[in-house]
Regions:
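Primarily recognizes the serine-hydrolase "nucleophile elbow" in alpha/beta-hydrolase
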Residues: 134-143, 147-180
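Conserved HGGG/HGGXW glycine-rich cap/lid loop of the alpha/beta-hydrolase fold
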Residues: 80, 87-103
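A glycine/proline-hinged amphipathic helix-loop "lid/cap" segment
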Residues: 1-67
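Short beta-strand element of the alpha/beta-hydrolase
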Residues: 74-84
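Catalytic nucleophile-loop/oxyanion-hole region of alpha/beta-hydrolase
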Residues: 90-91, 97, 110-149
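A generic structural signal for alpha->beta connector loops
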Residues: 49-51, 59, 106, 147-149, ...
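A fold-wide structural signal in alpha/beta-hydrolase
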Residues: 77, 106-110
Length: 180
């Protein structure tokens, strides 16, 4: 297993250490958000996808990435919750990853942005994740999504939301994703 950091990341870590940057736990939530967004440029160029749509619901937002491959009668579906310790992260911090997932999986990728703390304490993000998942799954036919090939995923706090949402769907007796 390769335990070496990529050169750009290693340089960034060295710069942080040399500059005496404070620990994330010592930063304000606003500063953490700004830093997370600023780090998104390290992801490189954005891949072109077939189309992007975005809309706002009551307390959450959804961005749909459509693949640029030929039309499909029923696309696999990925519902993705971004990470950021529940304090930061949004569509822009994860845009490059969503584009890559969309193109490499030839899938519809629904990125979900939930409410963040501290403005919206627990269980706001959890409730948003469940509501968004139910809304997406109910509307899959309009996007040619395959209800039998739905996966919930996320990174960091988003991985937690994917897990908890799956458990809440199961407890409610609702349709479950094929993968999580």
């Amino acid at each position: 297993m390769n335990t070496q950091l990529e050169p750009a990341i290693a340089a960034m870590v060295a710069d942080f250490i040399a500059a005496g940057r404070p620990k994330a736990s010592k930063l304000s939530w606003q500063t953490r958000r700004e830093g997370y967004l600023a780090s998104a440029v390290l992801g490189g160029e954005r891949e072109e996808v077939g189309a992007i749509e975005e809309w706002q619901a009551d307390h959450y937002a959804i961005r749909l990435y459509r693949p640029k491959c030929l039309p499909c009668p029923a696309y696999p579906v990925l519902i993705y919750f971004h990470g950021g310790c529940f304090v930061s992260g949004d569509f822009e911090t994860h845009d490059r990853q969503m584009r890559m997932l969309c193109n490499s999986a030839h899938a519809l990728v629904f990125a979900v942005h939930t409410r963040l703390v501290p403005e919206h304490p627990y269980p706001a993000a959890h409730d948003d994740a469940l509501a968004a998942t139910l809304a997406i799954m109910a509307a899959l036919p309009q996007w040619h999504g395959d209800p039998g090939r739905v996966a919930l995923a996320g990174d960091s706090a988003g991985g937690h939301l994917a897990l908890v949402t799956t458990l809440r769907l199961k407890a409610a007796g609702a349709a479950l994703p094929a993968a999580q």
